[in-house]
């Protein structure tokens, strides 16, 4: 189901799954493969989260060198859908080259594009992102795009062929939670492709808020990997995403300035 669909129009079947680039998934939690103490912990956390998709930094994770521990031996491609990403790329050329190498290595064409502006904030460079997106789409890739929370750029990315829009909630690895709910709501309401919060989630309540706003899914890495107990946090995130989605579909009560008694006042003794 696309995020812009309202709760009233949801069917039981569409509620249970979401689809990106023609691929359907049940889990709405995507997890990363960085910052864990080892691949075994990473794999255990991904399973505890109930994740079906794991995102992989092609430039930082060992996928092909058999002399070193291989991610694929722990987080198995037969168990998870790999989503190669361009973490660490600061130019469109680097991003395009990285994803072409990923496709050659593993045959992956569903990818996550991120082109960063500077090492301090890791904000996306939106001009470079849009330029490289067009090149990748022309080259046959299905591209999910990390972007700013700017509704105008989100629309431009979708028009350029992005299969999913992934606005940041806060800077990557900051754990600050969703800082601009208004813009995120606007992006969700206008999008005809899935919208996922990408970056900034710090704890379970942040994930729940993103889902309550109507996101199709949440992507996170540091919130789980740097928790004191990554496996327990992965479980918490799984339940938070489910709870947030259920709350969105249920439709929250209206906020009121004054009290409204839970029990009727008529007929008091």
Curated annotation (Swiss-Prot):
Q: Mind listing the GO molecular function terms for this protein? A: thiazole synthase activity
GO BP annotations of the record are: thiamine diphosphate biosynthetic process
Q: Which Pfam families match?
A: ThiG
Q: GO CC annotation: what is one?
A: cytoplasm
Pathway given for this chain reads:
Cofactor biosynthesis; thiamine diphosphate biosynthesis
Q: Which family does it belong to?
A: Belongs to the ThiG family.
Its quaternary organisation is: Homotetramer. Forms heterodimers with either ThiH or ThiS.
Biological role: Catalyzes the rearrangement of 1-deoxy-D-xylulose 5-phosphate (DXP) to produce the thiazole phosphate moiety of thiamine. Sulfur is provided by the thiocarboxylate moiety of the carrier protein ThiS. In vitro, sulfur can be provided by H(2)S.
The protein depicted here goes by the name Thiazole synthase
Q: Which organism is it from?
A: Caulobacter vibrioides (strain NA1000 / CB15N) (Caulobacter crescentus)
Q: Which gene encodes it?
A: thiG
């Amino acid at each position: 189901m696309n995020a812009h669909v309202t709760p009233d129009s949801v069917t039981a079947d569409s509620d249970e799954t979401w689809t990106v680039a023609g691929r359907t998934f049940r889990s709405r939690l995507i997890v990363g493969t960085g910052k864990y103490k080892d691949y075994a912990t990473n794999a255990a956390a991904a399973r505890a989260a109930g994740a079906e998709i794991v995102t992989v930094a092609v430039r930082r994770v060992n996928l092909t060198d058999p002399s070193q521990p291989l991610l694929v031996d722990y987080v198995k491609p037969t168990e998870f859908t790999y989503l190669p990403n361009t973490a660490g790329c600061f130019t469109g050329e680097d991003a395009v080259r990285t994803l072409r190498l990923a496709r050659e290595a593993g045959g992956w064409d569903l990818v996550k594009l991120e082109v960063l502006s500077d090492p301090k904030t890791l904000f996306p460079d939106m001009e470079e992102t849009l330029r490289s997106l067009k090149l990748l789409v022309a080259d046959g890739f299905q591209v999910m795009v990390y972007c700013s929370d700017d509704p105008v750029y989100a629309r431009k990315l979708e028009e350029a062929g992005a299969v999913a829009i992934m606005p940041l909630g806060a800077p990557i690895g900051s754990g600050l939670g969703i800082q601009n709910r208004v813009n995120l709501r606007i992006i969700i309401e206008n999008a005809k492709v899935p919208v996922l919060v990408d970056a900034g989630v710090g704890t379970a309540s942040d994930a729940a808020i993103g889902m309550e706003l109507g996101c199709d899914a949440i992507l996170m890495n540091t919130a789980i990997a740097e928790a004191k107990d990554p496996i327990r946090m992965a479980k918490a995130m799984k339940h938070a995403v489910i709870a947030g989605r259920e709350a969105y579909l249920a439709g929250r009560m209206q906020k009121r300035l004054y009290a409204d008694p839970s029990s009727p006042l008529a007929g008091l003794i």
